[in-house]
Each structure stands twice: as structure tokens, then as C-alpha cells.
Amino acid sequence: MAVTVSAEEWVPRTRVGRMVKEGKITSIYELFEKNLPILEPEIVDYLVPDLKHEVLDVSLVQKVTDAGRVTRLRVLVVIGNEDGLVGLGMGKAKQMRFAIQKALANAKLNITPVRRGCGSWECTCGEPHSVPFTVRGKSGSVEVILKPAPRGTGLVAGDVAKAVLRYAGIKDVWTHTEGETRTTHNFAKATFNALKQTYKFLAPWDWVQQQ
């Protein structure tokens, strides 16, 4: 549904985009490690061609102008490769197609890595199927706490949080939520913000990898 630009047609507008197009950067994780900003959605298309997406919410919004009330569609989209990358974006437009395109572009600009692990004391498989430690995220009145779960538990969460977790590659997790979780946007963003916390600090088992 989104309009993507092929590698040949893409003309980078930023320094990072030119570095990607010239082959100086070959992995999206290089951008995260070097703290380089993603200012063009085509950068993500170029480096992560296997991204999937899902529309989480569609709602009508109105804006009062001199010409009267203007009604537009507001779309919330989650993207991810189900292997440690996830993004969340919102787009507004009069037509569904363009609203989804804007939401996808914003989700790509917001894409973030997710550190996965086997953080539950009940599980010693060592596989990256859950979160490595307890993390929490907040958006508006909604707060989401993600706790490591043993293998086979599944995603113990609401439908909106499940979608965000699934696209991030999380397979087993316990969740605790507070606030008005019926607000899809805040629920999704709180879950997304919690996942971002997995990269805020290093666990002891990551120290050796960073040396």
C-alpha cells in the first residue's frame, strides 16, 4: 500500500542518505551505534527491505478552518522485521491511501532496535525470545511494564500491545498496564517506549560484546 522508491530512483537528500547509497553504511545497526539520525524513510527501505506493517487504528479527526470543518483520516501503523526492529507512526490525510503512506514514512523515521534475551529466572534456554529485563514505557495516561517470561508463555498482553511486540520479535512476555488502555495510540506508544528502554543501558552479559 505504500509507495516505495527503488534503489536506482532514490536521490538522497541528507548526508546519512548519501553514505547509505554509496555503500559506506551497509547495516541499519551502524546508524544506531554511531547515533546517526534517520531523516529519510528511504534509508530504512534501502537497509531493511523485509519490513512488514500493520494498521493498528483508523479514526476520523476534524479541523475547523475558515472554509468550515475539514474531516481527515488518522491512521496508526506499526512496522517491524520480527527480528529486533520496530517502528510506530501516525499519518493524517483525506484519503486512506495517503494517510497510510504518511504513517509508514513516520514509522520508518521512528524505527528503533530492540534488545531481546532470556531474562526470566524460570527459563535458561539462552534464546532471544523475550525481553532481557523488566522495562516500562509511558504515553499519556497509559503505562506499560514488560517483564521477561519463560519460553512457551506467549504474549500475555492486550491486542494492540501484542501487535507491537510481535513485530519487534518478542515471543514471550508478561505485561502489566495502567491507565486508559482503550486509547489505542497511547497503548501502542507506551509499549513502543518500553521496548526502546531495552537499549538504554547494558546488562552484564552485554559488557563483553561492547569491549
Curated annotation (Swiss-Prot):
Keywords, alphabetical: Ribonucleoprotein, Ribosomal protein, RNA-binding, rRNA-binding
Transmembrane segments: none
Annotated S-S bridges: none
Domain of life: Archaea
One GO MF term: rRNA binding
InterPro entries in UniProt: Ribosomal_Su5_D2-typ_SF, Ribosomal_uS5, Ribosomal_uS5_arc, Ribosomal_uS5_C, Ribosomal_uS5_euk/arc, Ribosomal_uS5_N, Ribsml_uS5_D2-typ_fold_subgr
Keyword rRNA-binding: yes
Domain S5 DRBM residue range list: 51-114
PROSITE patterns xref list: S5_DSRBD
Any one of the GO BP annotations: translation
GO CC annotation: cytosolic small ribosomal subunit
Record family assignment: Belongs to the universal ribosomal protein uS5 family.
NCBIfam families: PRK04044.1, uS5_euk_arch
Function summary: With S4 and S12 plays an important role in translational accuracy.
Domain remark text: The N-terminal domain interacts with the head of the 30S subunit; the C-terminal domain interacts with the body and contacts protein S4. The interaction surface between S4 and S5 is involved in control of translational fidelity.
Assembly and oligomerization: Part of the 30S ribosomal subunit. Contacts protein S4.
Protein name: Small ribosomal subunit protein uS5
